[in-house]
């Protein structure tokens, strides 16, 4: 299990992980790593939350929120934000399915992708600022949001098909079973309940699950399945929806 965790940490983040810690794990077994997603999200959110807490006393709430969002993006290498931008460029192009998938593969940033990035990043900064001004625990909120959003991404993997012939998303999409999905969602729910007691966290998770499930169905209808880009989009939007649900 430890090798699986370190392999997933190096796969979906840019945090430095010694290669020997995940040696011996075949790439074809990476799908089992879905159950570590909430824990990885917990770690990322906690680091981002600590950045907020340290900077808040020095430069105030808005700048602390800005830098916490920036640190979160840097830790993932902008991986999920890139998926969000590519997904929006493709889906909102209003072209054929095949053309949408081609656009999503294009490394150039389009208008819709740029607008999506601006909206999501600004929305996160504003929501974090508002939560802080209301006295909500930012470290716990960010840790829970990142854990839940990555856990809920399993909803776009279980019983979904990969929309392309090959790609990184093919490691997970359509490869996880019901037990893995339930364990992943269960871990995310536990983290949300412990970090944000009084059912506040669980209620926010339910709202996020509904939103991401609907998103998954819309993407399935539009693209014929899911891709690594749509998983990234789901994680980014999941974080935002969870934080909004805490307001």
From Swiss-Prot:
It is found in: Cell inner membrane. It is an enzyme of class 2 (transferase). It catalyses: alpha-ribazole + adenosylcob(III)inamide-GDP = adenosylcob(III)alamin + GMP + H(+); alpha-ribazole 5'-phosphate + adenosylcob(III)inamide-GDP = adenosylcob(III)alamin 5'-phosphate + GMP + H(+). The chain crosses the membrane at residues 34-54, 59-79, 113-133, 138-158, 194-214. One of its GO terms (molecular function) is adenosylcobinamide-GDP ribazoletransferase activity. Its cofactor is Mg(2+). GO terms for biological process: cobalamin biosynthetic process. It is a multi-pass membrane protein. Its EC number is 2.7.8.26. One of its GO terms (cellular component) is plasma membrane. It holds the Pfam family CobS. Keywords: Cell inner membrane, Cell membrane, Cobalamin biosynthesis, Magnesium, Membrane, Transferase, Transmembrane, Transmembrane helix. Joins adenosylcobinamide-GDP and alpha-ribazole to generate adenosylcobalamin (Ado-cobalamin). Also synthesizes adenosylcobalamin 5'-phosphate from adenosylcobinamide-GDP and alpha-ribazole 5'-phosphate. Belongs to the CobS family. This is Adenosylcobinamide-GDP ribazoletransferase. It comes from Shigella dysenteriae serotype 1 (strain Sd197). The gene is cobS.
